[in-house]
Amino acid sequence: MFISQICVAAQNCVSPKLTNAFAIFFSLLLFASTTLGATIVVPAGGSLQAAINSAAPGDTIVVDAGATYTGPFTLPLKSGDAYITIQSSRASEITGRVSPSQSGLLAKLRSNFGAEPVIKTAAGAHHYKLIGLEISTFTASDFIYDLVRLGNGDSSQSDLSTVPHHLILDRLWIHGFQSQELQRGISLNSAETTIINSYISEIHAIETDTQAICGWNGPGPYHIINNHIEGAAENIMFGGADPKIPNLVPSDIEIRGNLFFKPLSWKVGDPSYLGRRWTIKNLLELKNARRVTIDGNIFQNNWVEAQAGTPVVFTARNQDGNAPWSVVEDVTFTNNTVTNTQGGVSILRTSAESKGAITSRIRISNNVFEKIGLFDAFVLLNNPNDIQITHNTVFKGGNIITIDADPGTPKGTGLVIRDNLFSEGGYGVFGSGIGEGAPALEGYFSSYVYSKNNAAGREGFMYPVGNSFVLSSQVGFVDQAGGNYRLTSSSPFKNAGTDGKDIGVDVNELLAAQGTIAPAPTPTPTPTPTATPTPTPTPTPTPAPTPTPAPTQPASLQFTSSAYSVHENAGSVTLTVTRTGSTAGSASVTYSSLDVTASGFSDYTGLAGTLTFAAGESSKNVSIAIVNDTIVEGNETFNLILSGVSNANLGSPTVTTVTIVDNDKGRRVKIPRGGVTIERRKVR
């Protein structure tokens, strides 16, 4: 067996002194051996595109680790079903997921050719492997839409025959720069594609949605496994634009063992914030996707910015109105950890914005939700069908579940909430316009199961029988503070689930699915080494110094009160934010409203914005318009929340509750089950 080696460089690698006879022999040998797979070496300065063009199926193109190759590069269509491999000369030294610290082992592919991707596929290109490459632009000033483009999302790809397929991206570092604006790491509009062991970072822009990975015009299947994934708006999204291929739904998507991560240096007000306010939305969003397995991942860091901070969103959208077949269905979300976010999972069945698209058949099981902020663990909008929420352990600040629907929306069916452990915080299961507990479930779903859940600290009479309300401190976690959510042998929830398993998460199953993946550490400054002090002679006594004035306290921003009350006919309510401590220089804080029982559409005017304090200013007001309706609905509430700050700290309180005192009179209606009395069922 002969394996040939070709050198592709700036100069001819075959010496001109070779005799014609030897050259002919070499050519014949090359022809014979390439059928078995040639190794094509492209040293620094060589033409990688020429090597790609000349490669045959089965060939391996080796590029020098540490060398830079200038693109853009195109993977052309070739006949044959053996892979053409493009890999670093030191790829074998990288085991598992690559990291930026291994840059020296990677060959560097760069481009600054307008908005062209560094690597793209030709129509129908197939059977390529990319291994051990660093893919980026030359400088932070180079704007680019896609660093890697697999397939096309426009009308040039309007039927399945032109879709690239059988593509493998392995141990790649795909990245922008800290201050750079670019739209996508990988544009994923291909078929049969694997992205594995890679590191995608610094994908962000201002006032533009950006994604580390985004696909909308490829059929799948996709395998996204063991990657570090950073994207400002959405780390991964499927949908978001209408497919140009009729009836296409990205399908058979496997997302396993990844770290979905947003650096806190992107967060306004964090000590590590770098001063660029990127558009931040969520960590994973499905708008058009079918048969999706999301298993064994970690979702870390998401906050209020362009959206409410919910990290996982399932919301079917016929985005541009030309794809009424769009769906989000048959999604499994299992063995994941969601940590340090404002909420959990939001599921929207359909809406006017969805233009007919439907979300259904979602299973959320055996996950941990921890360090969840003031928003809700789960949000169900417009009554999605066949939703299962089972065996989760949830530590949250907001409601367990908030349910809401547009007027006239039919009730949902097949809701199952079972065998979960829910911490204190917020309300339990809350139905907008109805209240808490069984009435909320019955008001929005014609069939449901709510059993063997522990809703810590809630009132049992509001809920169906067969549930518990034990405080989290009495659940019997092995080490709640340390993050070990296994149950002790004496826990009342040990082996007490519907299936005979522990109520809440099976930690062993979760860790087995996550493997070696771990949350990213919180960055801490490198300590300055302390020099060994030089011995000093015994000092001569000196007079006591004049006392130094106490240092000026750093500025903090907070509401003057944690609660306000306003009559419905008052027209507006004014809330005051104060700056205490130093008032030198400017400072700012963002604010946003959050519905509790009041609606930002029909009861008050929902809002978000930024308060900026000039030097010397110590207070600012926020005025909120109140709607004076004629509906008998009882008192209703909403929150105003302070979040990102600049040149100050957040004080306390940062959340204030506004109660709108109803001024309408009418007949009270008694809801028999749960003993809840309301003025009128009001659906928004």
Where are these regions (language model features)?
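Short glycine/acidic-rich loop motifs that flank beta-strands on beta-rich extracellular proteins
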Residues: 71-74, 98, 113-119, 138-148, ...
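Ser/Thr-rich, Proline-interspersed low-complexity disordered segments
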Residues: 520-552
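Right-handed parallel beta-helix
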Residues: 87-88, 126-137, 161-176, 191-204, ...
